[in-house]
């Protein structure tokens, strides 16, 4: 097949697809911008790097959003050409050429501006009726009806221009927007509110008197005034009227800004639902509707003021630090086991709580008495099999008692078993006496350990060695 240029590919794509006139204009505009930069060249001759150079040039004169429109439409043309073998390319040269546009809030029209524009149009209507002369915007009654239709419905400009006489049902108070005229290709209905009803009645009655048929364009200024000679009303005539409103109010006004405005106002009202706005504007998904929502700064300011009036209450008291417990869950009984016998202790009942306290007092004497009992308790084997080869320094009797007190006071239960403290008791007694108790393995010699010091063998098999400045080896 003969190599084709991009304009030829674009024309081929338009012929093989059912596109709206406005969509065709966008494809041709993007192709024209391409030709202005590259000239008359084959579509297969431009590479991805060439497209990036073109993007850099275009972004110097147009917005990022406009460039993305060019990129997406021409990328579609290249994809179509590659799929049908119209161009010999393996990779779409416009792939990954989209840029991230700056996110700006939707442009809306203030209520005071709308009131001024409406009052001016009403004044022009009265002026034409009283003088019989053409006003600056003529016929004023027709343009007031167009103004109110955009204000109350938020209809798209193309959808309004494509409305037929038969699409307006005054009996059911509904406007039917045909799918072939909509951006989303979906047909939907728009209810006629009370404020718009008188204006549509005037338009429909006048159209009936003029002799409109069911398929005629209902909003057609050319048939309501002899001053215009065109067959159909187009977007240029509507935009010309809004330019005059812009000059009068000093604020830019367009049909699409009315669409932004109605979406924002509906979503500021709590009784409105986002799905109502979505259906009214005929959006394909809820995310598109959310983009039209403007933040309510007055409500934000009110909430911020309320927060400032409610000062935080600061508690300057020290909060106790409660360590986290990894024990049983709250409410579950914790089993109590004897450290000597290993049997589970029975919890005390409520009836015997007082008796239990008395028994605890009798069976658990004060700490001082417990230390006296330790001094007479029998010794147990501290070292079971391994000989002692550590060095420690003697401590005084008071220090030994203080260390024992700290160990006893940390006991979590009142039934702290004295049998577990026999090791500590022996350590206290021997340190207080200035002696060290060791157990000697069978293969060791006591002389090696004591180094000539007098040692006494106790009945339980331990050797008592006096403290000295020397080290125990």
From Swiss-Prot:
Tyr recombinase domain residues: 118-305
Main location: cytoplasm
Alphabetical UniProt keywords: Cell cycle, Cell division, Chromosome partition, Cytoplasm, DNA integration, DNA recombination, DNA-binding
Record region (Disordered): 341-365
Coiled-coil regions listed: none
Active-site feature positions: 156, 183, 256, 259, 283, 292 (o-(3'-phospho-dna)-tyrosine intermediate)
Boundaries of every Core-binding (CB) domain copy: 4-82
Any one Gene Ontology molecular-function term assigned to this protein's record: DNA binding
Skewed-composition ranges (Polar residues): 341-352
Any one cellular-component term (Gene Ontology): cytoplasm
Any single GO BP term: DNA integration
Additional notes on this entry: In contrast to other XerC proteins, it has a much longer C-terminal part.
Protein purpose: Site-specific tyrosine recombinase, which acts by catalyzing the cutting and rejoining of the recombining DNA molecules.
Entry's family note: Belongs to the 'phage' integrase family.
UniProt name for this protein: Putative tyrosine recombinase XerC
Organism listed in the record: Pseudomonas syringae
């Amino acid at each position: 097949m003969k190599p084709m240029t991009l304009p030829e590919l674009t024309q081929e794509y338009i012929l093989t697809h059912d596109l709206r006139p406005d969509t065709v204009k966008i494809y041709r505009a993007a192709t024209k911008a391409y030709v202005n930069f590259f000239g008359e060249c084959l579509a297969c001759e431009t590479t991805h790097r060439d497209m990036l150079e073109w993007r850099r040039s275009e972004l110097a004169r147009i917005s990022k959003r406009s460039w993305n429109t060019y990129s997406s439409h021409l990328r579609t043309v290249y994809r179509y050409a590659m799929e049908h073998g119209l161009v010999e390319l393996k990779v779409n040269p416009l792939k990954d050429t989209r840029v991230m546009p700056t996110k700006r809030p939707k442009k809306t029209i203030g209520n005071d501006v709308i009131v001024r524009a409406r009052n001016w149009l009403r004044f022009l209507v009265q002026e034409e009726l009283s003088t019989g002369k053409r006003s600056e915007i003529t016929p004023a009654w027709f343009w007031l009806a167009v103004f109110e239709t955009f204000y109350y419905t938020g209809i798209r400009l193309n959808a309004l221009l494509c409305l037929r006489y038969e699409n307006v049902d005054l009996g059911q108070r509904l406007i039917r927007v045909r799918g072939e005229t909509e951006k989303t290709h979906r047909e939907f209905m728009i209810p006629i509110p009370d404020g718009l009803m008188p204006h549509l009645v005037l338009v429909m009655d006048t159209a009936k008197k003029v002799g409109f048929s069911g398929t005629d364009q209902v909003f057609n200024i050319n048939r309501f005034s002899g001053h215009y000679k065109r067959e159909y009303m187009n977007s240029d005539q509507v935009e010309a009227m809004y330019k005059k409103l812009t000059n009068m109010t000093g604020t830019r006004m367009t049909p699409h800004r009315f669409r932004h405005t109605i979406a924002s106002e509906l979503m500021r009202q709590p009784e409105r639902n986002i799905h109502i706005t979505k259906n009214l504007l005929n959006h394909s998904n809820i995310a598109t509707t959310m983009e039209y929502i403007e933040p309510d700064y007055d409500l934000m300011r009110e909430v911020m003021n309320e927060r400032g009036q409610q000062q935080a209450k600061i508690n300057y008291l020290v909060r106790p630090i409660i360590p986290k417990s990894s024990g049983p869950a709250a409410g579950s009984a914790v089993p109590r086991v004897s450290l000597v016998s290993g049997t589970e202790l029975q919890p005390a009942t409520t009836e015997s709580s007082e008796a239990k306290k008395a028994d605890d007092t009798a069976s658990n004497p004060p700490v001082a008495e417990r230390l006296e009992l330790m001094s007479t308790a029998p010794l147990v084997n501290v070292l079971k099999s391994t000989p002692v080869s550590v060095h420690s320094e003697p401590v005084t009797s008071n220090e030994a008692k203080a260390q024992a007190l700290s160990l006893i006071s940390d006991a979590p239960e009142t039934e702290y078993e004295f049998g577990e403290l026999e090791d500590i008791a022996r350590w206290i007694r021997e340190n207080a006496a200035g002696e060290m108790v060791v157990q000697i393995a069978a293969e060791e010699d006591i002389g090696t350990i004591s180094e000539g010091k007098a040692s006494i063998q106790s009945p339980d098999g331990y050797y008592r060695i006096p403290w000295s400045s020397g080290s125990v080896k």
